[in-house]
């Protein structure tokens, strides 16, 4: 696991234990099972008019960039991004480094119809049950921070609750691991988690290794119409785009430009 992942997970453990004390796992699981089924995340990740589907990411900050959007209004953003053509939304719920909140996702679930991905650093079944309870259609599992056995366990648990899983890989070994464990949505993150640098050629190389029948997602580095088209040429069905949108004066206008609508 990279240094930043270790740091983030260490800070989240105490918070997770407090959440478990307030709402025990059994109760959270019942909430998850009682929650209404939302739109399918996987089904939404289909190309439209030649463009990869856009998973628009709502985040106020990141470890690499600091505060990206000081005037962060998630209740307004989710609706604006849906109307601008987002196929799905990725909602950061990690509090310390991304300044996210589970409440942002829960609120978005009442305002939009497109599927919601819980973007967090997930290593415990509780987080998955909570995601389902607050309105997520999918969760992110990061190969770099999970053993193959743990990945497989969490993947199966998410599927048992009707959640899709975006399985994130940074290299060939991680990609092979998630595919061997049944991943049907494979995401490639070309960010070096030690230096925070981006190398989009990593995305292009790894996406071509994902077999047919598995949804292919470019998870980082799409910062222009040109890189979106490069992702498409490499076989991407979808692209997750956050910083480009959140740093724009109008995220909705920026999304329309990305899709070639403006």
Annotate each language-model stretch with its function.
Residues 55-73, 114-123, 164-169, 217-222:
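Active-site mouth loops of central-metabolism enzymes
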Residues 123-134, 170-181, 218, 222-241, ...:
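Catalytic cores of alpha/beta
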